[in-house]
Amino acid sequence: MAEDMETKIKNYKTAPFDSRFPNQNQTRNCWQNYLDFHRCQKAMTAKGGDISVCEWYQRVYQSLCPTSWVTDWDEQRAEGTFPGKI
């Protein structure tokens, strides 16, 4: 189990600096990367492409966003009440 934790820590990557969001508050950065991931996924699926190119956005929003926000947004997307334009 300790080896698993060490592997996770070694492979953990946080979100890199994004010049569009230079201030400490990263709420907008979280939101934008969540939207970008789902837009990328939708576009690549429509083209029949590989959605693995979208994984970068997913890693960033998972690093920045609280889990409860992501869960709520996923539920809203499933219900059709998500406020963002994807």
From Swiss-Prot:
GO biological process, one term: substantia nigra development
UniProt family annotation: Belongs to the cytochrome c oxidase subunit 6B family.
Transmembrane segments: none
All copies of domain CHCH, residue ranges: 27-73
PROSITE patterns attached to this UniProt entry: CHCH
Species: Homo sapiens
Record disease entry: Mitochondrial complex IV deficiency, nuclear type 7: An autosomal recessive mitochondrial disorder characterized by encephalomyopathy resulting in variable clinical manifestations. Features include muscle weakness, gait disturbances, neurodegeneration, cognitive decline, metabolic acidosis, feeding difficulties, poor overall growth, cortical visual impairment, and hypertrophic cardiomyopathy. Serum lactate levels are increased. Patient tissues show decreased levels and activity of mitochondrial respiratory complex IV.
Pathway: Energy metabolism; oxidative phosphorylation
Residue interval(s) of motif Cx9C motif: 30-40
Pfam families, per database record: COX6B
Protein name according to UniProt: Cytochrome c oxidase subunit 6B1
Cysteine pairings via disulfide bonds: C30-C65, C40-C54
Keywords, ordered alphabetically: Acetylation, Disease variant, Disulfide bond, Membrane, Mitochondrion, Mitochondrion inner membrane, Primary mitochondrial disease
Example of a GO MF term: cytochrome-c oxidase activity
